Amino acid sequence: MAAMSLLQRASVSALTALSCRRAGPRLGVGSFLTRSFPKTVAPVRHSGDHGKRLFVVKPSLYYDARFLRLMKFYLMLTGIPVIIGITLVNIFIGEAELAEIPEGYIPEHWEYYKHPISRWIARNFYDGPEKNYEKTLAILQIESEKAELRLKEQEVRRLMRARGDGPWYQFPTPEKEFIDHSPKATPDN
């Protein structure tokens, strides 16, 4: 495309130069040596759109499209069966109804939920409130024992300082192997 435009421009300029030389000063165009012949007008093509087309460097959309395609696939793969399962549970099982509790019967913690899916989740994945209560009591007992031990340690340190029987009044003695008993030239060696 560019070669064709260049070829056309060269041919137009050559024809103009030849025609100006032949016409001479009669047309008032000027002489061939002064290079005053008219400018050539060649069409500039921009591929049919508005303005010059630029080569814009942009990142590839391959990974974005692949991610969206896979996300749609896996949503459909998991979403459709889940919707079908929830619909079947709502149609055939339905929500629980409130009834009188028989004498001496202690309901389980999941029996307080109305919907069967909530009951199933509470029964299989969550701990009961009694178990949570016992866990909290165990944590509180451990923390209270730690606090008591800290208080006892502070009291022991205070008494050791007051009576002077702490480790700061003792100096570590060197081991017997480190003592050099060989004769020395001066006492400080």
UniProtKB/Swiss-Prot annotation:
The chain crosses the membrane at residues 73-93. Keywords: Electron transport, Membrane, Mitochondrion, Mitochondrion inner membrane, Respiratory chain, Transit peptide, Transmembrane, Transmembrane helix, Transport. It is found in: Mitochondrion inner membrane. The keyword Membrane applies. It is a single-pass membrane protein. Residues 1-46 form a transit peptide. One of its GO terms (biological process) is proton motive force-driven mitochondrial ATP synthesis. Complex I is composed of 45 different subunits. Accessory subunit of the mitochondrial membrane respiratory chain NADH dehydrogenase (Complex I), that is believed not to be involved in catalysis. Complex I functions in the transfer of electrons from NADH to the respiratory chain. The immediate electron acceptor for the enzyme is believed to be ubiquinone. Belongs to the complex I NDUFB5 subunit family. This is NADH dehydrogenase [ubiquinone] 1 beta subcomplex subunit 5, mitochondrial. The lineage of its organism: Eukaryota, Metazoa, Chordata, Craniata, Vertebrata. The gene is Ndufb5.
